[in-house]
Amino acid sequence: MYDTVVIGGGPAGLAAAISANKEGAKVLLIEREPKLGGILKQCIHDGFGLITFKEKLSGPEYSERFIDKLFETDVEVKLLTFVTKIEKTENGFTIYFVNRDGASHVSTKTIVLATGCRERTARQIFIQGTRPSGVFTAGTAQNYVNLM
């Protein structure tokens, strides 16, 4: 059983996992993407890190610093993992998830939901019509540009 399961590996999830671990909790961090960092991976402008790291960093640089701090701990991380269900139990919660290893579940005393933000498609907000091939949301376009 975990003390804390953090769902989401963006800036808030990373900070929560590191803080909980620092307080002595046994922590699992679950992230649906192949990489940690969340929205920060898209923020190529600088200005991050002035307070925490005392220097001006881009979003990806800032997230890498937190990822490095995370991997200095014994927090368990599951990438490419999608939470399918959360059940309240007598002793906490059961979190069901699926990943490349198949379907599984874990028990935890507490949950931190740090699922972040992402843009929604026209269909998700009930705008009728079709999207032409090659048209992306701003966030998707930023992500592709930053990967190149």
Residue locations for each model-derived region?
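FAD-binding core/adjacent interface of flavoenzyme oxidoreductases
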Residues: 1-5, 64-69, 73-148
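Beta1-alpha1 glycine-rich phosphate/pyrophosphate-binding loop at the start
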Residues: 2-65
